[in-house]
Amino acid sequence: MEIDYYDYEKLLEKAYEELPENVKHHKSRFEVPGALVTIEGNKTIIENFKDIAEALNRDPQHLLKFLLREIATAGTLEGKRVVLQGRFTPYLIANKLKKYIKEYVICPVCGSPDTKIIKRDRFYFLKCEACGAETPIQHL
């Protein structure tokens, strides 16, 4: 069976019209601000923590909980920044943020960053707003 090229174009246009507005006009590039890390004595401060959480479209508490578990330390959210107990390199913080993005932000099906975390019964899912896929994720 041969598919007519013009029928394909019409179907493609129709599919595009069905997409949600936030998907049609999203930025082609996903940009997250780099962590501004300062070390003061035995504390590490991420100055722009809230900005990072907003760029990822995630609750700062969720991101903080992940970060604290990953680097096995205590920390607090103070306004727009986070204060961590201990000295941690900017490289380590950046790697942990990349891991968070891979596990809790980017859709594993289509690669879109337009996702949200939803809870159904006792389980958590990463729901993609671009392709509609729901992927189970580990609860923090």
Curated annotation (Swiss-Prot):
Entry annotated with the keyword Transmembrane helix: no
Keyword vocabulary terms for this entry: Initiation factor, Protein biosynthesis
SUPFAM superfamilies noted in UniProt: Translation initiation factor 2 beta, aIF2beta, N-terminal domain (SSF100966), Zinc-binding domain of translation initiation factor 2 beta (SSF75689)
Keyword Ubl conjugation: no
The protein's assembly and partners: Heterotrimer composed of an alpha, a beta and a gamma chain.
Domain of life, per lineage: Archaea
Family named by the database record: Belongs to the eIF-2-beta/eIF-5 family.
Name under which the protein is recorded: Translation initiation factor 2 subunit beta
InterPro entries attached to this UniProt entry: IF2/IF5, TIF2_bsu_arc, Transl_init_fac_IF2/IF5_dom, Transl_init_fac_IF2/IF5_N, Transl_init_fac_IF2/IF5_Zn-bd
Gene name of the encoded protein: eif2b
Entries under SMART domains matching the protein: eIF2B_5
UniProt-listed PANTHER family: EUKARYOTIC TRANSLATION INITIATION FACTOR, EUKARYOTIC TRANSLATION INITIATION FACTOR 2 SUBUNIT 2
GO molecular function: translation initiation factor activity
Pfam families the record matches: eIF-5_eIF-2B
Protein's job: eIF-2 functions in the early steps of protein synthesis by forming a ternary complex with GTP and initiator tRNA.
